[in-house]
Amino acid sequence: MTETLTGRLSRRQIACLLAHDIADGNCVNLGIGMPELVANYIPDGREIIFHSENGILGMGPEPGPNDIDYDLINAGKKPVTMLPGGAFFHHADSFAMIRGGHIDICVLGAFQISATGDLANWSTGGPESVPAVGGAMDLAVGA
């Protein structure tokens, strides 16, 4: 990591610190927002398999400006890259992986986290929207 760790950490510094804590060989679900940055900072020589609940296994770092493919997106509808050997599958199979305990770590984005670990990471959107937590509850239990 080339950034200096002084004062408040940036989103990229947090992602870098987290990436260095992930053990070699782990299967990791990356949530939406700041968690997406983690794939950019995996140490050389460490193999981590990244998962997205929309049915992707084997994501790589974020794409450069000339590498964006809008047909290749994560659960947050953001462009991603794939590593050799990556796979696509139905989201029901993706949730079977999560619920079956086949994901080692989940990196969730959060709006708030209490001192006791309670997580608030969803929004109702507009006043007419139906509230939904997405895959967070499955991931919090299954990973």
Task: Report each predicted region and the residues it spans.
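Conserved phosphate- and dinucleotide-binding cores of soluble alpha/beta proteins
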Residues: 2-13, 62-143
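N-terminal active-site beta-alpha-beta segment that forms phosphate/nucleotide-binding
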Residues: 1-84
